[in-house]
Amino acid sequence: MASADPGLAPLGAAAEDPTKGGIEIGARGGEERPVAPDQFDARFETGRWEIWAYYAYYIGNNGLTLFNFAPTAFQNLLYQAAGDNMTLYFAGRDRTINSIVLLANGISFAIQIFVFLVIGSFADFGTWRPNILIVLSVVAFAVGFAWLGVHTEEKWRVGLGLYIVGLIAYQTTLTFWTAAFPGLARNTPELRAKADEYSQGAITRDEYDFADSMKRNELSNVAFIVQSVGEIFILAIIVGVMFGVDVNASVANNNWGLSVLIAFATGVWLLLSIPWFVMEKRRPGQDPGMNIIAAGFWQLWRAMTQIWRLKQ
């Protein structure tokens, strides 16, 4: 996707060569030979430990913290603060618990739309994605540990804020983590060999694209399997933590137990994310053909104009 620079200053380093996948004209008699869509740099070759570091981050970012236990803790505080009348004063008037939760979700998603419009394109373009993932992860860790101080009903408003920010942090970290796997797949030794075969005319472009797709699917599916197995062990430890805190003894113990579980799962996430932060190779992303921020809005506009052409 190429376009004239709209006049905004570039916000990322130079990305990949936009001529990839074309036809190179040879010096002798106009001879043509295919150019592999992925030009390899030995510095960016994907290693086994880097792939496992990628999987490890997903084990940590399993959703137990800000997507499962945090919503439960938040709604617990709402019900306890509301009492028998089941209403609380929020956003200018008394509202039911369901209304408050729905409004909180709406606020969270509205902010996510804005965030993804502004920085979403950095997941695919330029070289900023790893740094953005680190920053967003730190925000998520801070929210997770902050729940240790929010476990009584009078702090339900603080819980509301943590709930909203936590949802945003979880979704954005997951998005920027997911965006790394095409680069991992296309820099594996297997895909490098396929690119050489394609450049030599041994395989067709369709065969190369099929190998690329299969490698990406392999990394994505294995990541899900590894994450699921790892989550089982985390949940087993969590059961022990619940008994240790004696969550069934009282409402206060149950509230405290949820906060402890959120913090524990956050600690696991933090530890498992460090290898990925250290071992990820800063590969260049795609070339947006324009300022990276503008590229996000351009993609939205293009989707809105092209969606009507989809077959029903």
Give the positions of each predicted feature.
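Intracellular loop-helix junctions on the cytosolic face of multi-pass helical membrane proteins
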Residues: M1-E50, L148, V158, T172-Q312
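Helix-loop boundary and gating motifs at the non-cytosolic
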Residues: G21-Q112, Q312
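Conserved glycine-rich helix-kink/hinge and helix-boundary motifs of the Major Facilitator Superfamily
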Residues: Y55, S99-L102, I134, M214-N217, ...
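C-terminal ends and interior cores of transmembrane alpha-helices
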Residues: A104-F109, I113, L133-W156, L160
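A generic transmembrane-helix signature of 12-TM secondary carrier transporters
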Residues: S137-G144, L162-Y163, T266-I274
